[in-house]
Each structure stands twice: as C-alpha cells, then as structure tokens.
C-alpha cells in the first residue's frame, strides 16, 4: 500500500478563490458513472475537519491518497476507497460543502490520519475535489486549448483513471461570468497491427479572459472504463513551455 505522508502546515490546503462553478460537478451516481464531460473550474475548497489541530505531535502527520469518497448525506463524506484498493471508514463523517448529493461517490484527494496501524477506521482531515473529465458523447463545438502549466501525469494503481496535476493561472476579475473550464476530447482512433487501438486525446482549457496573476494547483482524472485493456492512450497538453504528450497503456480494471 502506497501513501504520501505529509505534515500539516498552515495554508497547506487553500481554496482557488477566483474560480467558480457554473453548476455542480456531477458525482459518480447510483449507476456508477460520472455524468459530466466538461468541467468548469470552481472554488476548489478543501473540506476540512474543524477539530484538527496543527503541531508537531503524531497528529501533525497525515496520509494523502486519491480516493473515491462516498457521501451518506449531502455535504458529508462517510467512507472512501483509495486507488490502492484500501477501504477507509471515517470515525466521524467529514463535512464537505462540494459533495452536494447524498448517497453518491466523488473523486477526491483525501488527507487523513489512521487511528492505529491495521485498522481501516480513520480520522478525515480534509478532502480536495478532483475534477473528472469524461469523453463527450459527441463532438463539442468549442475546443479551446489555452496553455496551462503541467506538473505530473500517472495511471492510478487500480487502472481506473489517468490523473493529471496541473497549474492554472488565475486572478480576480470582478465579473461573475468569468469562469475557466477544463475538458477532454478524442481526436483520433488508430487500429494497431497487434489488434489494440491507439486513442489520441486532447486536454481542453478555456482561460476565458481570466487574469493570469498567479498559479493554483488543480488535479483532474480521466476515467478508463470506456477503453479496452491494452489500448494506448495519448494525451496532448498545451503548456506555457509548448505542447507535450503523455502516453499510457490501459490495464484491466
């Protein structure tokens, strides 16, 4: 089981204040599918436990995992499954303003403390929303590729997602309708000689004239359940340093 161990510091998880959501990002619904293909960037607030305190004792250190978190009721997370397949149960439900639908599953970067080694009962500390970008059912009319800053790309351990760590440039505009957006489209499908297919995807980014005063971190996940094991996924990303491509092989779920 792989975890990232982090020390809690003031301001570790902060909101992206100037970015707002046009409508709530759909969770994985009861049917088990993400419903949204194009996501508008929002105030990516990290839900945080109010009674968690900073300091240098053992509770200052926490684990961080990308998860599918389940809401018991609106704005409250009850349990989660990590990308490593570990089941986590929160001692107390984690209040989470962006998890707006009851009995639904959300993608998140979860910070938590384990009660004791070998136990799946944990204290939820905070949950940062991860944007889920699913391929649209049909070609979108607008496919902007405004540049952004690329940090990392990796396949989830369970093979369910390709994940991207990005930095977007943001700034206050004073206009409510100035919202950035991220999305993904598929440009080509190529049949390979060995029977597999190569899917070329393109990351979309609409800056929408939002001022580029400073950077803020955003994580996105692209579900792999629509592809066959062995297929190749190429993702083209337009960055401030020029275009780049990251390649992944789909693994069995």
Identify the function of each model-found stretch.
Residues 51-75:
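Structural detector for short beta-strands of small beta-barrel domains
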Residues 86-99:
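Beta-strand/loop nucleic-acid-binding surfaces
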Residues 116-167:
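Surface-exposed beta-loop interaction hotspot
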Residues 1-28:
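N-terminal secretory signal peptides that target proteins for export/translocation
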Residues 152-206:
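Short helix-loop boundary/capping segments
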Residues 43-46:
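C-terminal motif of bacterial Sec signal peptides marking the signal peptidase cleavage site
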Residues 100-120:
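Flexible glycine-rich surface loops and low-complexity tracts that mediate binding to linear polymers
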Residues 204-233:
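Short, solvent-exposed, Trp/other aromatic-anchored flexible loops in extracytoplasmic proteins
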């Amino acid at each position: 089981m792989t975890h990232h161990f982090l020390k809690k510091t003031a301001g570790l998880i902060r909101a992206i204040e100037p970015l707002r959501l046009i409508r709530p990002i759909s969770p994985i619904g009861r049917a088990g599918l993400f419903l949204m293909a194009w996501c508008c960037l929002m105030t990516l607030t990290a839900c945080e436990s109010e009674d968690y305190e900073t300091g240098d004792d053992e509770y200052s250190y926490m684990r961080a995992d990308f998860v599918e978190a389940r809401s018991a009721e609106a704005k409250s997370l009850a349990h989660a499954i990590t990308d490593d397949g570990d089941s986590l149960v929160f001692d107390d439900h984690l209040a989470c303003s962006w998890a707006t639908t009851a009995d639904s599953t959300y993608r998140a970067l979860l910070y938590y403390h384990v009660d004791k080694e070998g136990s799946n009962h944990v204290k939820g500390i905070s949950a940062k929303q991860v944007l889920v970008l699913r391929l649209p059912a049909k070609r979108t009319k607008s496919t902007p590729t405004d540049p952004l800053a690329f940090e990392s790309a990796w396949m989830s351990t369970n093979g369910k997602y390709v994940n991207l760590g990005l930095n977007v440039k943001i700034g206050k505009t004073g206009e409510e309708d100035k919202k950035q957006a991220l999305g993904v489209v598929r440009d080509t499908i190529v049949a390979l000689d060995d029977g597999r297919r190569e899917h070329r995807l393109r990351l979309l980014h609409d800056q929408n004239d939002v001022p580029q005063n400073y950077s803020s971190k955003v994580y996105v996940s692209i579900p792999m359940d629509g592809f066959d094991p062995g297929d190749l996924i190429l993702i083209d990303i337009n960055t401030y340093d020029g275009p780049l491509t990251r390649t992944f092989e789909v693994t069995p779920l």
